[in-house]
């Protein structure tokens, strides 16, 4: 019996942290511990109305608290059976508990009269009415851009699965692919698809609350809510949605506080069959400094990647962009852009925009020489502004600098030597390739002497940890990265 009382007290303590004084008073002040039978703890409510309301609002939260504290088999049962009228003092070894149950004993007397029950019910109804008045009548989604649609998304072999899944989610949110994580490199169309999901769902399901937000905005909003003591308002905003779309989830790496908040938000929405969609620049297994339990949540549903577009898709993208911008140039010029710019969709569109600028501002005829110049500018800009060049020259540069600085050979780095200094060099090589290229862990493994995905992932995580804990290692990695960037 005492254990059951302690469990109920724990639940009250945890719930009180998340509610205002008014809320806690309305919902929990008039509850009484009744009895425990096996794994069931019976709690008396003043009336049937109160029982139904508290089950609707707090069953899920109570279950979370029980699981979090290792009471997986315990079930809280609410009943409108009145408390026993005899004294039944509930003494425990915990003074705080004794005070709590002393209050409950007094409540047993005052909650049995019809007048008291009616007062409690009236107060709850007033509170519900107040809540409804505070709810926004028109839910706004400021970050959804109407220009992103499924209709203007160009489909190819590299993105077809992601496209089909996204469209399916829009038609039946919370059903088939929940959660969904779309991953791939920069500028490949992840944001376009994520925003399209929001726009199409809004079009098909007018009454749903849909929110698109970047991971950075999610973080900033959370930090601001802590500063202004409005975390409750933050939780209410995100945990009562019908669809949550978070872009660039990798930006939350190394940020434990917001990961904890996202974990609880995820659980609240998922358990209520609300749709969750995320984008990321890598697969969940390759996320570093992310809690395992959050990564496991991402893999519950569908994980689908978008790879780099092939030539046919690049050509289609360039043609469509040229048509939208009203550019009339020979097809061989557009094909040259598609052939040379292989990085991503964003760079292809940037090349076409530059073509338009030359035509509109300089009033000149576009020829192959100008196209070559534009492409060269884009490729140079890409190298200067991203840590993800993905071509043979850059990989070779990384390797060359690593071998020179660590004074090792090609045979060392690609062989099977177990010497500590060689093993360390391989870990560093994997880490540098992961940070400076778009290569997957499998592709990195092939470069480093046929290592497996898990081996490469271990190397990356190890260097990540060592940089935080070992100043010498951190300085070495920083120096290597600076030399690679300069080169």
Curated annotation (Swiss-Prot):
Biological process per Gene Ontology, one example term: regulation of DNA replication
GO molecular function, one term: ATP hydrolysis activity
Stored PROSITE patterns: DNAA
Localization per record: Cytoplasm
Region entry Domain II, spans: 79-142
InterPro entries in alphabetical order: AAA+_ATPase (IPR003593), Chromosome_initiator_DnaA (IPR001957), Chromosome_initiator_DnaA-like (IPR020591), Chromosome_initiator_DnaA_CS (IPR018312), DnaA_C (IPR013159), DnaA_dom (IPR013317), DnaA_N_dom (IPR024633), DnaA_N_sf (IPR038454)
Region (Domain IV, binds dsDNA): 360-487
Region (Domain I, interacts with DnaA modulators): 1-79
One Pfam match: Bac_DnaA_C
Gene3D superfamilies: 1.10.1750.10, 1.10.8.60, 3.30.300.180, P-loop containing nucleotide triphosphate hydrolases
Binding site for ATP: 187, 189-191
This protein's UniProt keywords: ATP-binding, Cytoplasm, DNA replication, DNA-binding, Lipid-binding, Nucleotide-binding
CDD domains: AAA (cd00009), Bac_DnaA_C (cd06571)
Region of interest called Domain III, AAA+ region, as start-end residue ranges on this chain: 143-359
An annotated GO cellular component: cytoplasm
Sequence similarity: Belongs to the DnaA family.
The protein's role, per its UniProt record: Plays an essential role in the initiation and regulation of chromosomal replication. ATP-DnaA binds to the origin of replication (oriC) to initiate formation of the DNA replication initiation complex once per cell cycle. Binds the DnaA box (a 9 base pair repeat at the origin) and separates the double-stranded (ds)DNA. Forms a right-handed helical filament on oriC DNA; dsDNA binds to the exterior of the filament while single-stranded (ss)DNA is stabiized in the filament's interior.
Domain comment quoted from the record: Domain I is involved in oligomerization and binding regulators, domain II is flexibile and of varying length in different bacteria, domain III forms the AAA+ region, while domain IV binds dsDNA.
Subunit structure: Oligomerizes as a right-handed, spiral filament on DNA at oriC.
Protein name from the UniProt record: Chromosomal replication initiator protein DnaA
The species this protein was found in: Borreliella burgdorferi (strain ZS7)
Gene this chain is encoded by: dnaA
């Amino acid at each position: 019996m005492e254990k059951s009382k302690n469990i109920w007290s724990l639940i009250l303590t945890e719930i009180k942290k998340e509610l205002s004084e008014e809320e806690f008073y309305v919902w929990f002040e008039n509850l009484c511990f009744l009895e425990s039978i096996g794994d069931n703890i019976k709690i008396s409510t003043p009336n049937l109305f109160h029982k139904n309301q508290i089950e609707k609002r707090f069953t899920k939260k109570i279950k979370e608290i029980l699981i979090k504290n290792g009471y997986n088999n315990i079930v809280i049962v609410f009943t409108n059976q009145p408390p026993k009228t005899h004294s039944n003092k509930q003494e425990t070894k915990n003074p705080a508990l004794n005070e709590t149950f002393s209050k409950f004993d007094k409540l047993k007397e005052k909650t049995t009269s019809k007048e008291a029950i009616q007062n409690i019910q009236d107060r709850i109804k007033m509170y519900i009415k107040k809540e409804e008045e505070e709810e926004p009548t028109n839910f706004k989604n400021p970050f959804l851009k109407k220009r992103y649609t499924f209709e203007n998304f160009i489909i190819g072999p590299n993105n077809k699965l992601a496209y089909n899944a996204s469209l399916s989610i829009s038609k039946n949110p919370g059903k088939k692919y929940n959660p969904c994580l779309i991953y791939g490199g920069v500028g490949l169309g992840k944001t376009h698809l994520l925003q399209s999901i929001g726009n199409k769902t809004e079009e098909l399901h007018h009454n749903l609350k849909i929110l698109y937000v970047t991971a950075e905005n999610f973080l900033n909003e959370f930090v601001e809510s802590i500063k202004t003591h409005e975390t409750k308002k933050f939780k209410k905003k995100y945990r009562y949605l019908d669809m949550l779309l978070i872009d660039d989830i990798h930006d939350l790496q190394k940020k434990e506080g917001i990961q904890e908040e996202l974990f609880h938000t995820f659980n609240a929405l998922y358990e209520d069959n609300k749709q969750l969609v995320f984008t990321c620049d890598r697969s969940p297994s390759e996320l570093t400094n992310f809690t395992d339990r959050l990564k496991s949540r991402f893999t519950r549903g569908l994980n689908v990647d978008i790879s780099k577009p092939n030539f046919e898709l690049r050509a289609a993208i360039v043609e469509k962009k040229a048509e939208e911008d009203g550019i009339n140039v020979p097809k061989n010029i557009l094909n040259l852009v598609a052939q040379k710019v292989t990085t991503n969709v964003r760079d292809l569109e940037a090349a076409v925009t530059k073509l338009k600028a030359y035509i509109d501002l300089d009033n000149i005829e576009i020829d192959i020489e100008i196209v070559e110049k534009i492409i060269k500018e884009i490729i140079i800009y890409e190298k200067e502004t991203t840590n993800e060049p993905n071509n043979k020259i850059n990989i070779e540069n990384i390797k060359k600098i690593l071998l020179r600085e660590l004074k090792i050979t090609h045979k060392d780095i690609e062989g099977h030597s177990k010497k500590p200094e060689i093993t360390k060099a391989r870990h560093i090589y994997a880490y540098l390739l992961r940070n400076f290229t778009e290569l997957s862990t499998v592709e990195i493994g092939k470069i480093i002497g046929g290592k497996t995905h898990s081996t490469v992932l271990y190397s990356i995580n190890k260097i990540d940890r060592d940089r935080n804990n070992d100043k010498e290692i951190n300085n070495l990695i920083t120096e290597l990265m600076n030399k690679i960037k300069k080169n």
